[in-house]
């Protein structure tokens, strides 16, 4: 007897295509065929049903969200702290997402990595699918422009158009599954192969910050191209060290064979508003003029806003950061004004 994953026939949407893709990644469902029907008797033959049937019951493997009274979110299911009403994609992700991520990455992935990916992928990939399928707008008021490039819109384009025959609907659904699945798998692998290694580098730099300076307010990373801002703020919250007031980050600039001294922004969304900009007397200076003013050899530049500067050597960059801390602490009123 054929094992079946059931979903509805007719026009399909991103949520059930994605739900079916996720289920097919799991050992217990990978050999199941997909039955698209609205016939209740046929659906009863299915081992698991998504986006049809009017029932959400994890114990019975039924994952619909259209029934009256359904209001579940990741928070109500005690999975994550998100309040967007779930679609069939979110329901399947809530219960099987960690296992799906592990399978895509080949298994034996650490639980800490899976937990981070599970949260991040819901926030950046799955939640919008839930919201769009449930008619939840991303903003209040009239949109300023139209966008049809989201995953839900692009997945919907696999449906037959009004002037095309509909005799290949199941094949088109498979194509939609493949499309959304490739997008999701790419996102998972990016996290594992690019995002996670960067996070490990930044976390190690944060943990070793007292080796750079006794204040613990300077962190240094050897990998100049490593993205740091998002990871830094996440790690700061996770380690509960926001009160430590980490102020500067130093990193190598392989392009110019020098080092950078960058002021930590006030939050991850800011670029020019910083906890402590580099000293006002240094700003806009370059080369010998900067070295003379700062008293530190090897000066390269300091941006006119004070958010970043440079030195020819690692030691020079550390010296700039240390002196900037001293000057900033000596001028608390001026520092507060610059932070506004």
Curated annotation (Swiss-Prot):
GO terms for cellular component: cytoplasm; nucleus. InterPro entries: MYG1_exonuclease. This is MYG1 protein C27H6.8. Pfam families: MYG1_exonuc. Belongs to the MYG1 family.
